[in-house]
Amino acid sequence: MQLQRELEEYWGMHMLVFATGWMGGFGVIRALVRPWDHVIMDHVSHNCLQEGAIAATRNIKKFEHLNQDEMERMLRETREADPDNAILVVTEGLFSMDADSPDLKFYQKTAKKYNAYLLIDCAHDFGHLGPTGKGTSFPI
């Protein structure tokens, strides 16, 4: 509980603490996504994110790594086909294998455009990247 309170103070928002990073990635997707919802994710997203999506829904699409156009096309097509259910776009702030990052402002703008949610896994950039050390996703 103390760690959770300290993280909430540091970030200025509510936090949920998991025992491992893998459980966090898996658990947050499993908790947010219903069986009829959709997940659109970078095809090299961490295994915990992919497994969380598989556990949550059958409606999963993966776009080519960092391909914004393909991500937007999938988002547009999914929203046109299903105007009612939720769509979660999943990416990482810093991909650990190649040390590359998506254009998070574009992802945020595009998710809003199609009434979708954006989940950014900041496990590999939290604490040492970004203007405040809070990672590449803070603030976007």
For the regions a protein language model found, what residue spans apply to each?
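Short, structured coil segments at secondary-structure junctions
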Residues: W11, A55-T57, Y114
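Conserved N-terminal alpha-helix of the aminotransferase class I/II PLP-enzyme fold
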Residues: M1-G21
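Active-site-proximal loop->helix
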Residues: N47-A56
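Conserved PLP-anchoring active-site segment centered on the Schiff-base-forming lysine
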Residues: V28-N47
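Conserved active-site segment immediately N-terminal to the catalytic lysine
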Residues: Y114-N115, K134-I140
